[in-house]
Amino acid sequence: MDRRQLIAGTAALALLGSRAVAQDVVASGIRPDFLPVEVPIQPGIAPGEIHVVPDTFMLYWTLPGARAIRYMVGIGRPGLYEAGEFYVGAKKEWPSWTPTPEMIERDPEAYAQYADGMPGGPDNPLGARALYLFEPGRGDTFLRIHGTNAPGTIGTAVSNGCARLVNDQAVDLYNRVPLQARVVLYPQTV
């Protein structure tokens, strides 16, 4: 499967929903187009994988029968997004967070105060759940697919390289994805 196949599969997307869902969205403050939705994808894409298409801020959890659940995500800022093939090497609930040395170097005012780490909780930037991306031979890449304490950043390129979801969607994805699941982060083209 390549990026073109996945994008071609998304061309036929149809939002599924109801009036009740739309009313819930208004009450929760989440835009209707940011809700997870089951969508058709190209046949032949294996179930049980995560595919992130950065140009559209979409993450797909693939299902049997050429279907996927589509989530809206925030992605890495220009120059910090890393395309590639990974696997889920760890999963954590309410993960602790420590900025990398590179993050502290880029923005010491924002990150130096957390050099010793921050415990998990509602103020933590990793949110309610995190999937840790690993590469064979490299181990932990420090890339994550995680929740966020800043839901307004979904649909934008603002992170330090990770893909982020609103917390309830991060919990939903976390509960579906097993360890060792394949993750594909496609290259940015725009």
Task: State where each predicted segment sits.
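Gly/Pro-biased beta-strand-loop elements
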Residues: 28-143
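Short edge beta-strand segments in beta-sheet-rich domains
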Residues: 81-83, 160, 178-180
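Generic beta-structure capping elements
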Residues: 91, 146-148, 188
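Short, cationic motifs built from Arg/Lys/His that form the positively charged side of catalytic pockets
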Residues: 3-4, 164
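N-terminal export signals
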Residues: 4-23
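Short, basic/aromatic beta-hairpin or loop at an interaction surface
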Residues: 153-161
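Short, conserved helix/loop micro-motifs enriched in His/Cys and acidic residues
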Residues: 143-154
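N-terminal targeting pre-sequences for secretion and organelle import
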Residues: 163, 167-190
